[in-house]
């Protein structure tokens, strides 16, 4: 797997494109906004988008979803408890950026322990509530990489003061789902630089 990355949208959300180069297919994680930038990244890879996976439903992670979905026809995956974020602006908090963001419902609802088999790759779904009720991280074990959304950042954690947030739940999620992984597992956050489990464990 090769991972491509752009910062997209006014909050510089990390959008990742995980590509299986052997078959020319890939998975987009968190198309946060600025569709033209995401489109250019995809075109440069020459890979086909076969799935769009969302770590959670906040507007800064789904801002370009409608355009990407229309352009690719790829199915959308989101945690069950964040599903209504796609259709309800009050849940995705788009009013914070002066918009009323609405999308069609997701094609697939993700549950803790699910294994998403996409583009010839397997991603383990870890429910990590705390930043949102339905937040998820996705672990690609062969590459020792976690697409972590806003659960954890380099030397920080996601906000818990927004609707559906819980500091206690977030800390529990990080301890039981992420800190049990090997030190050299990379954490690809929703904002800011990449970190590792080992680095965050030593903090």
Region locations from a protein language model:
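Conserved S/T- and glycine-rich ATP-binding loop of Class I adenylate-forming
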Residues: 18, 55, 128
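Conserved beta-strand hairpin/beta-sheet module of binuclear metal-dependent hydrolase folds
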Residues: 1-45, 137-149
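Active-site HxH/HxHxD metal-binding segment of metal-dependent hydrolases
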Residues: 33-118, 203
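Structured loop/turn residues at beta-strand edges in well-structured enzyme cores
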Residues: 1, 47, 119-121, 183
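Short, glycine/acidic-enriched loop or turn micro-motifs at the edges of active sites
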Residues: 22-23, 33, 59, 134, ...
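Metallo-beta-lactamase
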Residues: 92-95, 121-203
